[in-house]
Each structure stands twice: as C-alpha cells, then as structure tokens.
Amino acid sequence: MATTLEVQKRETTQHSEVTRLRSEGKVPGIIYGYKSENVPVSVDSLELIKAVRDNGRNAVFSVTVDGKKLNVLLHEYQVDPLKDVLVHVDLLAVDMNEEVETDVRVVLVGDAPGVKAGGVLQQIIHDVKVSATPEKLPETIELDISSLEIGDVLTTNDLPENKDYVVQAEEEETVVTVSAPRAEEEPTTTEAPEPEAVHGKDEEPVE
C-alpha cells in the first residue's frame, strides 16, 4: 500500500514564488507521467525527507492533486551543494500494473579475504538500472564480496537474480575488484658527481 504524501499544487512557477516556498521550508517540484500532465507542486521538505527515510528511495507514494489520486515515485531530485538542502523534486506518476525503470544502489556485503590480505577494494558501479512494477522495485541490490581474493572481479553477471525485477545492464561490466597493493618504491639516492679539476694556463702575476 502506497504511503500518503501531502503535496500542494502551485498556481505559478515564477522565481519569486519558488524563492518564497523554499524560505518556508517547502520544496518546489513537478508531477508528470501516467495520466498526468506536467503539474507544478510543492511539498514540505521535512515531510518528504521523513517519508523517504521511512519507506525508501524507491517507495510508491500516494498524492492528491486537483481531487485526483496518483501513485508517484521520487524520480529525480536536486540538492543545493552548499546548503545541503533539497531544492527541487520530480515525481513520476505510475501505473501500478506497468513496469518502470529506475536506478537502484548496489550495496557490497561481506568481508573480502583479499582486502584482509592487503588488497585494495574498488567499487566501479554504484547504481544499476532496474525494471519492475512499482511495488516490486528494490531499495538496494546486495552483492556478496566474501569470496573475493586479490585479483578477483565481480561483474554485472554476478548480481543476484530476482523474479520481481530485471537488472538492465551490459553483461560482464565490472562492478567491484580487489587489486594488489601498490609496492612501495625504495627511495633512491644519487651521488653528486665529483667536481672536475680545471686546468688552465698559469697566469703571470700582475704588477
């Protein structure tokens, strides 16, 4: 069952109105997608953060706009890098019976023996595209690294299969590796060359 999220329709998209909303702790946004034209809305910032924290980044939320109920996903969002606050959200209206595609975070689980042996763990891919019906979208995909030795690689083919969703990724793309540690270079010392003797003519004393 979708969690209810309170949104308010915006009557204007003028910059002054957007600034006012943000000063009041609200995030301007837009709803688009299934049975919905581009509808400008706003949502309370703290309420949105709490809803995502409690239900997950890929949760389905129920909103009401102009008396019409819609199921939406938090499709995209923008954050002010200086203030670390939400400044805009895109809410994608979805049909609960139709598959959608979204990014899902890849989480590494377990301890790699290669790391304990001094290897360096490097995660190359942090998110993958996943398609599923909205209520089946996973919050994360866990990848077990407990068998990785130095020199080992796990690819997109190693991501766990699940009947509820399909990972849309190129085959054999590297997700994580354990590489050998860099050898520390021995400091080298170079000896300064001996100064060469200068052979010149004997000078006559100046009177």
From Swiss-Prot:
An example Gene Ontology molecular-function term: 5S rRNA binding
InterPro entries from the UniProt entry: Rbsml_bL25/Gln-tRNA_synth_N (IPR020056), Ribosomal_bL25/Gln-tRNA_synth (IPR011035), Ribosomal_bL25_b-dom (IPR020057), Ribosomal_bL25_C (IPR037121), Ribosomal_bL25_long (IPR001021), Ribosomal_L25_dom (IPR029751), Ribosomal_uL5_bac-type (IPR020930)
Residue segments, region Disordered: 171-207
Keywords carried by this UniProt record: Ribonucleoprotein, Ribosomal protein, RNA-binding, rRNA-binding
A GO biological-process term: translation
Residue ranges, compositional bias (Basic and acidic residues): 196-207
A cellular component annotation (GO) from this entry: cytosolic large ribosomal subunit
Pfam families per UniProt: Ribosomal_L25p, Ribosomal_TL5_C
Keyword Transferase (UniProt): no
SUPFAM superfamilies in UniProt: Ribosomal protein L25-like
Keyword Repressor: no
Self-association state and partner proteins as the record states: Part of the 50S ribosomal subunit; part of the 5S rRNA/L5/L18/L25 subcomplex. Contacts the 5S rRNA. Binds to the 5S rRNA independently of L5 and L18.
PANTHER family found in the cross-reference section: RIBOSOMAL PROTEIN L25/GLN-TRNA SYNTHETASE, ANTI-CODON-BINDING DOMAIN-CONTAINING PROTEIN, RIBOSOMAL PROTEIN L25_GLN-TRNA SYNTHETASE, ANTI-CODON-BINDING DOMAIN-CONTAINING PROTEIN
NCBIfam families for this protein: bL25_bact_ctc, PRK05618.2-4
Function comment: This is one of the proteins that binds to the 5S RNA in the ribosome where it forms part of the central protuberance.
Family, per entry: Belongs to the bacterial ribosomal protein bL25 family. CTC subfamily.
Protein's UniProt name: Large ribosomal subunit protein bL25
Underlying gene: rplY
